[in-house]
Amino acid sequence: KGIKIGERATVEGDVVISWEFLENPALAGRMQTKHDERAFDLYLVLLKEFDGNSEGRIVLNYEKVASYLGLFDKMTEEGYRRQINRSLRKLKDDYNLIDFELYYGKDAQVRLLSYDDPKRPYSAPKEWYFQAPDEYWKYGWSSKLSQSAKFCYLINLAYVNISNASPWWFSSREVLAKRFNISEWAISKGMQELRELNLIDVLYDNPQGRPYESRLAKSYKVLPLYEPAWLELEWDKLRLAYGPKRLDAAKRYAKIVFKQNDPQVVEDIILSIDNFGNEVVKKAFDIAAKKRVDNSKRCYEYVKATIEKMENANP
């Protein structure tokens, strides 16, 4: 089955990534288990810098790459060049993904290699691929997320690209772990981090008599990447409108249902406290807080329904 690029194909800066990189047990999954985070990050940057030439060649500008990797403001030029060179060697020696030549004080020359035959140059995939948006680097998520969250973000992008219910898609942790050669713990950790950062939404199925251990994630929804500076501006607006104490209290409630980075939900909680009183709102969130993380009722919709139910019971 050939999966073609969708409507984001014309967006400058989007990066084409093959499913092979994620599924091949010798590549991304191995980087995850070996904690080769910087090699993982650098390889994605190399794909970003690749212009599609037939030789797989890239001129590696250290300053530019260091900026993408979040190293430029943290290290001297000598420091980030050394770190990048170390990751280049890992990509060559441990993963057979590249070949390269270094020149003192100058840009490096890198050649991407084929996944199937390292003796041949890399070529952009014609099927079974997906796109990582430029905002992943532009907004700094490439250096803000944990390694597990980065991997899970790519999984989300890959699956939503083949989903008939886009932007929603479905799978279990067990299936994902087996397919991508990483632990179920890494899947859970990465997905939960993305959920709490408001980068994905998650719905869980209702066990209907089955034990919670048999629960599967019903579906995941990829949400648009936002600029962290935008989020801070939204908090400033709410702080100005309602005061810091009310904002902080609402964010604490929102955290119970993993919406502490969603300004709309936080403001709605503030308004609910105004309309129904803190006692009612607190009771509803206390009920939700007793649910397991993977319980379908550990969500803001359930809290709102609980508040409404309590209000109807006491007209």
Q: Language-model segments: which ranges?
A:
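Short, cationic/aromatic linear interface patches
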Residues: 271-315
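Electropositive, intrinsically flexible nucleic-acid-contacting patches
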Residues: 1-274
